[in-house]
Regions:
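Nucleotide phosphate-binding/pyrophosphate-handling subdomain across enzymes
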Residues: 213-216, 226-239, 243-247, 257, ...
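Membrane-proximal helix-turn-helix segments that form the acceptor-binding/catalytic region
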Residues: 259-266
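ATP-dependent carboxylate-amine ligase catalytic core
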Residues: 62-69, 88-97, 121-233, 251, ...
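Extended acidic/charged loop-beta regions that coordinate divalent cations
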Residues: 201-250, 281-315
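Short functional linear segments
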Residues: 2-105, 111-124, 135, 178-182, ...
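Residue-level signal for inorganic ion chemistry
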Residues: 48, 106, 132, 215, ...
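C-terminal helical cap/extension that packs against the catalytic core
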Residues: 277-299, 322, 375-376, 422-493
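Glycine/aspartate-rich loop-and-adjacent alpha/beta segment that forms the canonical ThDP
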Residues: 500-516
């Protein structure tokens, strides 16, 4: 009853300074400077840009230090997130009105979230609320893409108001509890790092809007992820998508170690769903052990069952998507308290469910944009496995003898290694007449930028495809302009891959001001 009273306060009285200062109207003891600041959408985006980036946090794991230090950083993550939630005026029990489909994995998380959201929209009569909330990351163009309502980025005015509400709560705590100066408290010093802030912001918005059905994607890992402060009762279904090597410093250097982290989202009262990796028995054993440890049920979906079903052709391309569709179908069935048996579910997909799978959209993943007689193929793949899928998709989507333009970058991983693996999967070294390598900055910076990563990738391209002409750029706008010029001369096809940040920048260049 207490939690329900507090939760109602959150919805009806969102402009408050925080639980620690007791529930009270916004403005009580809040500084005059807070009340007189400009509070437009652009101001909200500027505030978010000041917060410590996720990269600054993950770089702490990249530093050469004892593994014990890494363990300590991981162990601190959940307590720190709980503290941040409390500073924002909430406690985990305030989330009790929301039922979550929680998704972790190395690849396919975004696709599963898109499919699950679209499926829930086909079942609106069975929802626990009136709308579907979705929280994903990263964004491609605008931060509000991360927080969606009924499959669309949250409205600008709702987003703007919510950013400042949460910002002010942390500011007040910075002054009253952290002993910061007014200037520091009103800035980024009193705020959690970006992903934690956005996660709290998402819950704040969902609670304000009365949303009770949410699809939530983990950021990195699972066990220590900011989203994993959810009480077990608030998770209706957990999904572990395809696993692979990524974020090694944080999660470990083997798939088994990474599986341990991902399976951290399994809960005692929630059924978990995953693909039965018959070729990786060691990985499956880790997942099963973790399910037993968490006292949760793990449903393993056999590939033969999914292949026999065949999936639904829709906006999200690629044969591999049938596995993501199956996971989403089962998770949604479980969320809605329907029969979630894999065999019966996949053999009895309704027309509404088929429409939901077909209609699902996820920008920047196997996306095709046609503009000015040029076809742009965009996928933010950034691991060996996902680049293999991009190669398959691109070969299936273009004539066998066609030449195209490649735009590639990967700023945080071994770009040359990833490029080489991708080219080996393309089978045909002459697939690209030109390859453009760029940093992820949108426009040209005043200061000189380090393009050594791009130069090394261009060298690898010249080594593996000597006939391909290469060029290095320090910004996306110039790269897109050159790609347009070249594409008009060489058949009008451009493939953009290697990084979601790159894909987002290219989309922004192609569609200025676009979000959804």
């Amino acid at each position: 009853m207490v939690a329900m009273i507090l939760r109602q306060k959150v919805v009806s009285d969102p402009l408050r300074c925080g639980r620690l200062s007791q529930l009270r109207p916004f403005g009580h003891n809040c500084s005059r400077s807070i009340l007189t600041q400009s509070r437009t959408y652009d101001d909200a985006l500027h505030k978010l840009s000041l917060i410590a980036s996720n990269r600054r946090i993950t770089s702490m794991f990249d530093q050469k230090s004892a593994s014990a230090s890494h363990s300590n950083l991981n162990a601190q993550a959940i307590p720190e997130m709980l503290t941040s939630l409390r500073q924002a005026g909430y406690a985990p029990e305030d989330l009790a009105s929301i039922r979550h489909i929680h998704v972790a994995g190395t690849k396919g998380k975004g696709s599963v979230c898109a499919f699950a959201t679209s499926l829930l929209l086909q079942h609106k009569d069975r929802l626990y609320g009136t709308a579907v909330g979705t929280y994903t990351s990263p964004h491609l163009i605008s931060p509000r893409e991360r927080i969606a309502v009924d499959g669309q980025p949250v409205e600008k005015d709702v987003f703007t108001e919510a950013v400042f509400e949460i910002w002010d709560r942390f500011t007040e705590v910075g002054k009253t509890e952290m002993g910061l100066s007014v200037e520091d408290a009103e800035g980024a010093a009193s705020k959690p790092f970006y992903f934690r802030f956005m996660t709290i912001l998402a819950w704040h918005i969902f609670l304000k809007l009365g949303i009770r059905d949410v699809v939530m994607e983990c950021g990195i890992g699972g066990e220590y992820d900011a989203t994993n402060i959810l009480p077990p009762a608030n998770v209706s279904a957990a999904v572990i998508t395809q696993l692979g090597i990524d974020h090694v410093a944080m999660l470990g250097d083997t798939v088994e170690k990474i599986a341990w982290h991902k399976a951290g989202i399994l809960k005692s009262n929630a059924t978990g769903f995953t693909r039965n990796l018959s070729q990786q028995p060691e990985v499956m054993e880790v997942l099963r052990q973790r399910a037993a440890e968490k006292q949760g049920q793990l449903v393993e979906i056999d590939d033969a069952l999914v292949e026999g079903w065949g999936g639904v052709q829709g906006n999200l391309k690629g044969d591999f998507q049938r596995h993501n569709q199956a996971l989403a179908l089962l998770a949604v069935k479980q969320h809605l308290d329907l029969d979630a048996d894999p065999k019966s579910t996949l053999s009895n997909v309704s027309s509404d469910e088929a429409r939901g799978l077909q209609a699902a959209r996820l920008r920047g993943r196997c996306e095709v944009v046609s503009q000015e007689d040029i076809t742009w193929y965009l996928d933010g793949a950034h691991t060996n496995e996902s680049l293999e899928q991009v190669a398959t998709w691109f070969k299936q989507s273009t004539p066998p003898d066609a030449q195209s333009i490649l735009i590639f970058n990967q700023q945080e991983r071994d770009a040359s290694h990833l490029l080489a693996h991708f080219l080996s999967c393309m089978d045909r070294p002459t697939a690209f007449s030109h390859a453009l390598f760029t940093r992820n900055e949108q426009t040209k910076a005043e200061d000189a930028q380090d393009t050594s990563v791009q130069a090394a990738a261009a060298g690898k391209m010249a080594e593996m495809a000597p006939e391909c002409q290469t060029a290095v750029f320090n910004n996306i706008q110039d790269t897109v302009a050159e790609a347009k010029r070249l594409a008009r001369e060489t058949g009008g096809r451009v493939l953009v891959t290697g990084s979601l940040h790159l894909v987002g920048g290219v989309l922004q260049a192609l569609e200025p001001g676009s979000v959804s």
